[in-house]
Amino acid sequence: CIRDSSGVKWIGDIPRDWEIPRLNFVTSKIGSGSTPKGGSEVYVDEGVVFLRSQNVYNDGLRLNDVVHIVPSIHEQMKGTKVQVDDILFNITGASIGRCCRFTKGIGEANVNQHVCIVRPKNILPTFLMYCLQSFVGQTQLRQLLKGGNREGLSGESFKNFYVLLPSPNEQQQIATYLDIKCSKIDHIVATQKKKIAYLQELKQSLITNVVTGKIKVS
């Protein structure tokens, strides 16, 4: 394919027929949530899923320590109700920049002030997620943080992020390709983590057995 300069130094050359719009032009909503009145005191065991930055990872949502809010609070926070295909993007703290797509099957959900809802329009949600996870999205984030915005990413700054925009067909092809490849890599990583955990347990057991005399070394 014929490539031209993107006009953005750190992006470099891109296919000639791709566009580089600002994030604001391919989304219908960019905004973070808030903490309900009463903070953690209002969390309940069952109810509406309330997502925090520790639930948002690049490989998807992790709900092992998710908290819940009652439906009435969810209604009070209706402006930050999460919809299927929203991109959830961490905008503060050590996990800033992590993002994933909100998928079917979780049910009703809301977010706190550390998570930004990015609602795609005129762009494939999965492609946008990968774009934000890529060098393109993460470089812009680092540049903002270097510029003194160490506290986090503001909605206004986020709206001005550049994103890449191929044709809808190319977006789908790219998203499908990355879904397959990333899934395989994630599986390998998970397998290696289990092996590492087993070896660490083995090491700890060996040390314990030697220092307590259960294993003789002479």
List the model feature ranges, each with a label:
Residues 19-59, 73-77:
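Low-complexity, Lys/Gly-biased intrinsically disordered segments
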Residues 164-218:
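Amphipathic alpha-helical coiled-coil/heptad-repeat segments
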Residues 54, 113, 138, 150, ...:
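Glutamine-centric residue-chemistry signal
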Residues 40-42, 49, 134-163:
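Specificity-determining recognition surfaces
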Residues 1:
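Active-site loops and adjacent core secondary-structure elements that bind or stabilize anionic groups
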Residues 52-53, 71-135, 152-154:
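A short beta-sheet element
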